C-alpha cells in the first residue's frame, strides 16, 4: 500500500470514505465516524469506522435516512481517499432502540487474493515420478510470453489485477514450485517473495 505523502504533515486532513461497487464504481460518500486504520507494508492493511442509519440535514435540521445504508455490506468496497480501496467485511449492527449504526471493518483490496486459490500449481518441476503437469521454462516475469511468466500464471485467477514494475535483475530468474492448494495471496507473499528475495507493493488505486 502506498501511503499519502502528507500523512504525517500539518496539511493532512481526514480522508473521504466513498462506498463503491465491487468494480470500483462509486455509489456515494459515507458520513464515517470513529475512522481509524492500521497500515502495513508486508501484509494487508485494515480500517474501521461507523455509519449511522440516519443523519441530520444541516440546512433543514431534519433527521433523514442515510442514503445507501443497506448497501453497506460485506464484499462491497470503500475508497479511502489517498490510501486506496478496501473490501468491506460483514458489518456489525448496533441499536439501542433509538439509534442504530453499523460498525465496519475493511481490508485493503489485496485481501481479495486470499479468497482466490492456486490448485495443482506446479512450476519448473518436470514431469518426473509423481510430478505430472509441470509448466517448465518459467521465469518470474516475461511480458512477451505470459504462458512462461510466473506472475502472469498466478494472476490468471485474480480478476482485475495487472502487473506493474518488476526489477530487471529479478525478471529472468527461475525457481521451482509445487502447490496442492494455496491462496494466491499466501503464495505471493510467502513462497514467491521468500524464494526470490523480493517484496510486492500493491497499488489498489491504479
Predicted segments with their positions:
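Short conserved beta-strand and strand-loop elements enriched in small hydrophobics
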Residues: 17, 70-81
Amino acid at each position: 500500500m502506498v501511503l499519502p505523502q502528507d500523512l504525517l504533515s500539518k496539511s493532512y486532513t481526514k480522508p473521504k470514505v466513498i462506498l463503491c461497487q465491487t468494480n470500483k464504481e462509486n455509489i456515494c460518500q459515507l458520513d464515517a465516524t470513529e475512522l481509524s486504520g492500521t497500515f502495513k507494508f508486508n501484509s494487508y492493511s485494515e480500517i474501521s469506522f461507523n455509519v449511522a442509519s440516519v443523519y441530520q440535514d444541516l440546512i433543514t435540521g431534519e433527521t433523514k435516512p442515510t442514503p445507501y445504508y443497506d448497501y453497506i455490506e460485506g464484499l462491497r468496497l470503500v475508497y479511502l481517499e489517498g490510501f486506496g480501496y478496501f473490501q468491506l467485511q460483514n458489518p456489525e449492527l448496533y441499536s439501542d432502540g433509538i439509534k442504530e449504526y453499523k460498525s465496519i471493518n475493511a481490508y485493503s483490496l489485496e485481501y481479495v487474493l486470499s479468497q482466490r486459490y492456486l490448485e495443482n500449481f506446479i512450476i519448473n518441476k518436470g514431469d518426473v515420478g509423481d510430478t505430472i503437469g509441470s509448466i517448465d521454462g518459467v521465469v518470474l516475469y516475461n511480458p512477451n510470453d505470459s504462458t512462461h511468466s510466473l506472475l502472469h500464471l498466478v494472476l490468471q485467477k485474480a480478476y482485475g489485477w495487472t502487473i506493474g514494475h518488476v526489477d530487471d535483475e529479478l525478471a529472468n530468474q527461475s525457481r521451482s514450485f509445487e502447490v496442492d492448494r494455496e491462496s494466491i495471496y499466501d503464495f505471493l507473499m510467502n513462497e514467491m517473495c521468500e524464494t526470490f528475495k523480493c517484496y510486492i507493493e500493491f497499488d489498489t488505486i491504479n
